[in-house]
Amino acid sequence: MKKQKKNKQEDSVLPKQLNRRQFLEKLGISAAAGISLLSPGKARADNFRFNEASRARKGDRLHSRAAARAYRSANVKHPNNGEEDDFPYLFNYTKSLPHDSTTGEVVPRAYDRYIAALKKNNFDALENIGTGFRPLENPQAGLALPISGMDHQRYKMPPAPRVDKAQHSAEMIELYWQALCRDINFTDFDDDVTVNEAASELSSLSGYAGPRINSSVSPACVFRGNFFGDLSGPFVSQFLLQDISFGAHTIVQRLTRAYPSGTDYMTDFDDWLFIQQGNNFKNDPDYDSTPRYIRNGRDLASYVYEDELYQAYLNAAAWLLEEEAILDSGNPYHRLAATSNYVNFGPKRILCSVSDVSMLALQAVFFQKWFVHRRQRPEEFGGRIHQHITGARDYSMIHDDVLNSEAVAKVFTNNGSYLLPQVYRQGSPTHPAYGAGHATVAGACVTVLKAFFDETYIVKNPVVANSDGTALVPYTGADKNSLTVGGELNKLAANIAIGRNWAGIHWRTDYTESMELGEKIAIQMLRTQAMQYPERHSFSFTRFNGSPITIRGRGFK
């Protein structure tokens, strides 16, 4: 990875493009004169000792201010959507708990024991819940106390859409359509019949909250993200396609563990129930043997199954550093010549910030998952739809739109069931859907990157995958010369978050609301970190809602 440049070339920030030697000569300062200033006895280490008591007082004030910011107004109310009370045991997360072998519903006593254990929030109670082969994933993560940013329990998320409302139905219909469109190349969307049918039905739904163009859903915007940049350029962000120089290595972004086309799971009720009971298939799936660039929804789903927590954003940071993308104008080293931003505000800080914020984001969203919302996974709701339409159970509280959906009917024609087809054999992870871990981390990490880099910087030479994903070809769209760092970072976050929707394991609001949660977490972390730097600085960027924000650090002596 190249050393990050302050603007373009390190010496280019000096007056009239002078290099350092010319700059010193212009000031009349010779190398010898510079050396003579360091007379014996003047540069002893003793002269550089700091007042330890003063520094301790500064540190104590900093920690006190940070703690006050993190924990003030800690008594925050966290409402959920009320389904747990209104429709007990039916529409909340229950995967890996014991289920009735006929109805597919959770055993009530098991659910009550699970809720009681969460309220006690200790290891012994959680260990005695009784689950299948797959354990519940880390309920106590959301109880961790942060030492940077704000307390996890001060962040709020709105209640998730309810099963008896149009928005919930629209989100499920979108997932059925995504299952039907998984193997269609993004570059073929405009002319594909199924994609056009999907856009048409989604456009007709009053509860659909995805992007629209001129009030309609079209192939140009269907299944894309909701924020700035998501509708510009190719479907896939450049940060998921272009090669990345990472230290002494070059990362070629072909997938080597991708699910093959046409392979869906959990389309049979017995298989579905087997997975809901917490079981798992012993054998790994057969992956596509040909390395491919991301070209369709199944490829995106494959990426977000194998990715590490902040992999995509660390890669994006490395790409931006290698490309010498311009830093944010508030970076204190933006126009300095004698000192550089090697640690503070430079490559090391940027890379570490992506890691730092990702853990804060994950812990915060796990509090929302387990202790507030406990939203059902889409695959679980698919079981309710199947049982209702086949007449095995009566769930008349489900909003009619999804029960009468063209997408649901097409899935039945293909598979002989109304279950939501899954990309992964085991379906979702064993933790609730809302908020989404991938989406919260995405929102947090791209916010950090937008804070450090100039969002308006143009991404050069955009590319797309060819038809079989084996190579990259130039993107030739009309906007090929106007794709920005800010837009492509937002798109990267959408690709990762909605990639989980392509797999069938998350909802659209899991993406949208979690992105904004992640953004809040990143902002608070940046504000806390701003107090620790001696340099006066600022970060300016655009929030997901389109509003500008500036975070300032006053510095200290």
State the predicted function of each range:
Residues 13-14, 25-26, 31, 443, ...:
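Intrinsically disordered, low-complexity segments enriched in polar/charged small residues
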Residues 16-25, 33-48:
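N-terminal twin-arginine translocation
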Residues 1-19, 44:
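N-terminal secretory signal peptides
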Residues 2, 7-10, 24-29, 33:
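Intrinsically disordered, low-complexity segments
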